[in-house]
């Protein structure tokens, strides 16, 4: 039976929409000629997305939650927050803009609509002119960037019933970006009541009165052993008992005494007693468990001119909330007397000596945490932050534009440096740079490239300068599937930290927009059916704004074991047919209780799910990234001996049971590495931070002790390591050892196996799995010890790993890379790894022992490699420049030039070519340039369109789409770009293949003034003719004129549809905030031939738009046969071919010294 939870949320969403429908026109502002509420747009001007607002604000992406139905079109803000998540729209939007799906304003449609930034947008059919119905609208909101205080609240009650006291009032910080507001959130004021009598209850007491109290956790669990005190009586006056209760005689019932409680491992709590009768008062004190601080906002890098001001901001959370901060400059602690100890660091009148790295540390009772470093760049007078001369950026030209007989030809189109510029007037006392500017394109120049039979237009960067930055939004998409069966996890709840942000789809898909200033993206997926363990993941993302795709594998819960609460039981950890159990979980009798502390007696269903590191495949289902906060507040890695999740419930109940104390026994034979038996500890995962916390560390009981078999009265003669833990909430436990021998491994991804620097690919997720030491070393019988992931940027990725300097093969690793659903291939190592191919200099390559997965067996996949993690040795020049870097040289690893040693991956899909007249780096959305010929007209929303072409023929064929302006006056007939794709064979039909060809979507161009239906011409590059066109697609094109000329039977031409048609038409459209993710998802649907599926296996007969019949050209007779049949003709052909070869050779020699604007292939 399906869980009712998803149905409940769908009902809530329906109520949101119903609430919008019930709204009347008189409730809110009504507009018949405006699509923007809060600031009316000028229809003759560009969209407000490109205007400079006086307020520090930005537009959200577009939303469309409703389609025109019986009553009209309703885009309520409540429904948008439900479907897209509350983080997608700020609490108080400044403005709202609405447009139809054809990008028309309501005024242009002549429709009466209602818009309010606080409620949303709606259009009612009954209010429209006769014969008209509401169009399908989508909306976006304008949200403030800068944090600001709200209005003060009302004054509270006086703290004293007599005499002198004080009262408080509070205000809240309103910020959509998570920034903090300067100043205090509360204000105090003195208040005077009537004079107190001479003898007060505080001094005289009430002998016949009694105070009854209890000490509990926020969930209601009683706490025993808490020390209780009164503010007027120093020292401990009582201690809470077994059920968390205590009694204090002599406290007057009406005194409203302030009672405090303290307990090891918990923050202090205070509460006020209230009279329960004439002589009895009661109080409940809530103690929160101490939580180490963690950063929710890190200081950000800034650029300033000498003499300007700058503000760095740091914000930490924890239990209790950290209030003490320390600031460091280049590792040196700044004077607190001058800079203070708050979360803001303000520097005024900057000079060159203040440039460098800044970081903060936050403290509370549980520990400390260190932020990442922010770089402050101070420009000298006259120094430019943005070089007006563009950097080199090579793009590959089509094959028929290259030199005869040469390799691929590249053209330098220029690229502006990815740097920040100082604001026009510096920075005030606020966290964010509201008017931040970046180095961007100021001017483009048009060039013409002569190719074989045609001229190729291109626009190159001519000048760079400082302009307003485009908003950068990290985006993570992916899919959650079962680790054992691959079935999607449908409607799983998604938590960002502890806050719910949405659900997975029916196919298990999800999309998460990374909040600003996020360092670690911690996401939890909760299965509504309860069949899977909660999956807590730290998802790598690209802070530059490129989208990243992840596949999450959820671990199915183990079968239930029935126990008796009064007898307890033992459950093995990791027992399989191939390997004995690593240990066991011992649940003592009489220790089970309800979450509120009530003892539980009766049967218990226990599910203990173990992630066994002896199984290499289990790494993909492991939670978190195995990190913890060390004593210095820095992230440090752990090495696992296994993870386990415990689920204890009464049969048929949904309430989870707790255990006051459980023991974990680990077989000592599995812990062989020196020092690990002493360092092994029990850890639990905090789902809010994704960090592991040592169990019992505050009492010093988190480690293991050694017990012999005799002491444990066991039959087998074995030694065990015994540790203890308390089971509460829904936590994952871990058997780990901290590891200090750490390094970074440099990895780059390329578009092809030529490994050209200009073809580096960003957004690739590189995963490194630390394996056990080689045979001959003191190793544990396990397959992996930890894992780590990183996302490639413009300069590759640096992945953390364990390493050893003395023994090269003491640590080994297995490395893979993936982009979306595609696995990349590693550089080959057969028959012998060479430096030129692998990318690592000798003799370091020999010491690393690089081997691709198919090194010993060519039949295996090529998607990974193994290596020895040999730490570079001092004094060895070949090891000083990668690919392995010591832990303290992370900056050297990140900034290493492409000529330094690194490991390489390349995309398998090499039979694909893309050309844009206005160059755009899809992995760096900030490189977008506003131009009418831009392939992507909107930098905040990328729409990818694909056409599925079926080809009947004996081989695979290249298919080209030529995309030019169709209906727009300024671009009609002008080229947008080219796309070449090789068809993929149907796995079961050798005579059929299909190609998913990208074309430029129809819609608004950069100026947002007029729609253009792109003229798309699809041509297979072979002897092919068009034999069929999808009937629905032909019907649609006929009903939406004008029609494109279709005279050429060897091609298919159309004016791109404005609607997202779907698989029934053979057209696949996906809109996303990342161009790469939009294309990856659209290609997966195109391969599958469905509008909601995803496949990497081509289904050539499903969901096609047009079909071509191709045939092989007649084979040319051999030279011997031609000489026999027609000697004179054959000799003439040979002379002509030799003459052409001679001319090509002379041309190459002439152009060898001067290549003009063309760069050589690399």
UniProtKB/Swiss-Prot annotation:
The record, for PROSITE patterns, names:
IG_LIKE, TSP1
Mention any one GO cellular component term assigned to this protein in its UniProt record.
Answer: extracellular region
Tissue specificity annotation: Expressed in articulated and meniscal cartilage (at protein level). Also detected in heart, skeletal muscle and brain. Not detected in growth plate cartilage.
Q: Does the keyword Endoplasmic reticulum apply?
A: no
Residue ranges, annotated region (Disordered): 23-51
What's noted about post-translational modification? May be cleaved into 2 chains possibly by a furin-like protease upon or preceding secretion.
Q: Which GO terms describe its molecular function?
A: carbohydrate binding
SMART domains, per the entry: IG, IGc2, TSP1
Domain TSP type-1, first and last residues per copy: 146-197
Q: Pfam family example for this protein?
A: CILP
Signal sequence segment: 1-20
Annotated disulfide bonds:
158-191, 162-196, 173-181, 314-360
Q: Ig-like C2-type domain: from which residue to which, for each copy? A: 293-377
The residues that the database entry marks as glycosylated are 330
Functional note: May play a role in cartilage scaffolding.
Cited PANTHER family: CARTILAGE INTERMEDIATE LAYER PROTEIN 2, CARTILAGE INTERMEDIATE LAYER PROTEIN CLIP
Q: What is this protein called?
A: Cartilage intermediate layer protein 2
Naturally occurring in which organism (per UniProt): Mus musculus
């Amino acid at each position: 039976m399906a869980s009712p939870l998803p149905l409940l949320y769908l009902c809530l969403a329906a109520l949101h929409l119903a609430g919008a429908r019930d709204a009347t026109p008189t409730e809110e502002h009504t507009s018949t000629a405006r699509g923007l509420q809060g600031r009316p747009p000028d229809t003759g001007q560009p969209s407000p997305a490109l205007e400079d607002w006086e307020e520090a604000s930005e537009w959200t992406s577009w939303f469309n939650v409703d389609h025109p139905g019986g009553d009209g079109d309703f885009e309520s803000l409540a429904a948008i927050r439900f479907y897209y998540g509350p983080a997608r729209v700020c609490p108080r939007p400044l403005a709202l803009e609405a447009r139809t799906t054809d990008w028309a304003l309501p005024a242009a449609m002549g429709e009466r609509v209602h818009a309010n930034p606080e409620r949303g947008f709606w259009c009612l059919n009954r209010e429209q002119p006769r014969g008209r119905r509401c169009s399908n609208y989508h909306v976006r909101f304008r949200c403030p960037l800068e944090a600001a205080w709200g209005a003060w609240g009302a004054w509270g009650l006086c703290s004293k019933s007599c005499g002198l006291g004080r009262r408080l009032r509070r205000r809240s910080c309103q910020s959509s970006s998570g920034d903090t507001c300067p100043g205090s959130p509360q204000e105090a004021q003195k208040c005077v009541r009537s004079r107190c009598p001479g003898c007060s209850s505080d001094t005289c007491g009430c002998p016949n009165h009694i105070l009854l109290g209890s000490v509990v956790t926020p969930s209601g669990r009683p706490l025993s052993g808490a020390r209780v005190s009164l503010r007027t009586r120093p020292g401990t006056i009582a201690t809470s008992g077994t059920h968390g209760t205590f009694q204090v005689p002599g406290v007057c019932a009406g005194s409203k005494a302030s009672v405090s409680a303290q307990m090891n491992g918990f923050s202090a709590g205070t509460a006020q007693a209230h009279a329960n009768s004439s002589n009895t008062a009661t109080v409940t004190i809530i103690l929160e468990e101490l939580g180490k601080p963690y950063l929710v906002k890190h200081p950000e890098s800034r650029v300033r001119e000498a003499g300007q001001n700058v503000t760095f901001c740091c914000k930490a959370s924890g239990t209790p909330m950290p209030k003490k901060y320390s600031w460091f400059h280049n590792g040196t602690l700044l004077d607190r007397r001058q800079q203070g100890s708050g979360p803001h660091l303000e520097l005024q009148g900057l000079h060159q000596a203040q440039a460098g790295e800044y970081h903060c540390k936050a403290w509370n009772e549980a520990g400390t945490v260190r932020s990442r470093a922010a770089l402050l760049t101070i420009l000298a007078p006259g120094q430019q932050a943005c070089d007006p001369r563009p950097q080199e950026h090579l793009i590959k030209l089509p094959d028929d534009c290259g030199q005869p007989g040469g390799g691929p030809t590249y053209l330098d189109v220029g690229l502006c440096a990815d740097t920040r510029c100082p604001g026009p007037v510096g920075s005030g006392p606020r966290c964010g740079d509201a008017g931040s500017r970046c180095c961007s394109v100021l001017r483009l120049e048009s060039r013409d490239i002569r190719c074989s039979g045609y001229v190729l237009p291109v626009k190159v960067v001519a000048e760079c300068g400082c302009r307003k930055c485009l908003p950068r939004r990290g985006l993570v998409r992916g899919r959650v599937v079962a680790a054992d069966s691959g079935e999607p996890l449908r409607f799983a709840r998604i938590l960002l930290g502890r806050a719910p942000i949405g659900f997975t789809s029916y196919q298990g898909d999800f999309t998460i927009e990374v909040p600003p200033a996020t360092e670690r993206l911690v996401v939890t997926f909760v299965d509504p059916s309860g069949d899977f363990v909660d999956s807590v993941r730290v998802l790598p993302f690209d802070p530059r704004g490129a989208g990243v795709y992840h596949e999450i594998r959820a671990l199915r819960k183990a079968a239930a074991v029935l126990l008796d609460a009064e007898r307890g039981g033992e459950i093995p950890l990791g027992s399989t047919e191939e390997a004995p159990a690593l240990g066991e979980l011992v649940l003592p009798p009489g220790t089970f209780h309800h979450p509120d502390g009530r003892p539980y007696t009766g049967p218990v269903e226990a599910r203990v799910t173990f992630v066994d590191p002896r199984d290499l495949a289990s790494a993909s289902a492991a939670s978190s990234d195995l990190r913890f906060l060390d004593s210095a507040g820095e992230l440090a890695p752990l090495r696992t001996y296994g993870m386990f999740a415990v689920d204890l419930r009464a049969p048929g109940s949904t309430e989870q049971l707790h255990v006051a104390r459980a023991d974990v026994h680990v077989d000592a034979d599995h812990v062989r590495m020196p020092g690990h038996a002493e360092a092994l500890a029990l850890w639990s995962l905090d789902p809010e931070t994704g960090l592991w916390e040592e169990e019992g560390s505050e009492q010093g009981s988190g480690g293991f002790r050694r017990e012999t078999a005799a002491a444990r009265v066991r039959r087998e003669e074995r030694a065990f390591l015994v540790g203890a833990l308390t089971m509460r909430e829904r936590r994952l436990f871990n058997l780990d050892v901290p590891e200090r021998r750490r390094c970074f491994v440099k990895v780059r991804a390329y578009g092809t196996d030529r490994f050209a620097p200009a073809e580096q690919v960003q957004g690739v997720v590189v995963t490194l799995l630390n394996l056990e030491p080689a045979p001959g070393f003191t190793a544990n019988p396990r397959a992996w010890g930890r894992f780590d992931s990183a996302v490639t940027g413009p300069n590759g990725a640096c992945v953390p790993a364990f390493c050893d300097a003395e023994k090269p093969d003491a640590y080994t690793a297995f490395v893979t890379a993936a982009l979306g659903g595609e696995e990349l291939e590693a550089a080959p190592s057969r028959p012998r790894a060479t430096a030129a191919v692998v990318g690592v200099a000798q003799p370091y390559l020999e010491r690393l022992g690089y081997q691709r997965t198919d090194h010993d067996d060519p039949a295996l996949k090529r998607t990974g490699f193994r290596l020895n993690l040999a730490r570079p040795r001092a004094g060895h020049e070949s090891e000083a420049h990668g690919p392995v870097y010591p832990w303290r040289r992370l900056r050297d690893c990140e900034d290493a030039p492409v000529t330094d040693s690194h490991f390489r991956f390349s995309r398998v899909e090499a039979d694909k070519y893309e050309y844009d007249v206005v160059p755009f780096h899809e992995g760096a959305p900030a490189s977008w340039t506003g131009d009418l010929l831009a392939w992507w007209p909107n930098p905040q929303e990328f729409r990818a369109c694909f056409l599925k072409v079926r080809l009947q023929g004996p081989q695979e064929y290249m298919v080209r789409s030529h995309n030019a302006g169709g209906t727009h006056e300024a671009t009609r007939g002008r080229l947008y770009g080219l796309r070449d794709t090789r068809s993929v064979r149907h796995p079961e039909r050798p005579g059929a293949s299909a190609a998913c060809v990208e074309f430029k979507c129809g819609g608004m161009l950069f100026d947002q003034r007029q729609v253009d239906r792109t003229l798309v011409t699809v041509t297979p590059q072979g002897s092919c003719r068009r034999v069929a066109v999808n009937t629905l697609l032909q019907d649609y094109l006929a009903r939406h004129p004008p029609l494109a000329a279709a005279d050429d039977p060897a091609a298919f031409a159309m004016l791109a549809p404005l609607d997202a048609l779907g698989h029934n038409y053979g057209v696949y459209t996906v809109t996303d905030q990342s161009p790469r993710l939009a294309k990856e998802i659209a290609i997966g649907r195109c391969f599958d031939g469905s509008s909601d599926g995803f496949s990497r296996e081509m289904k050539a007969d499903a969901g096609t738009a047009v079909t071509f019949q191709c045939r092989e050209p007649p084979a040319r007779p051999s030279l011997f046969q031609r000489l026999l049949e027609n000697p004179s003709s054959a000799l003439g052909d040979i002379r002509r071919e030799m003459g052409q070869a001679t001319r090509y050779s002379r041309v190459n020699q002439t152009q060898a010294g001067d290549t003009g604007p063309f760069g050589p292939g690399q």
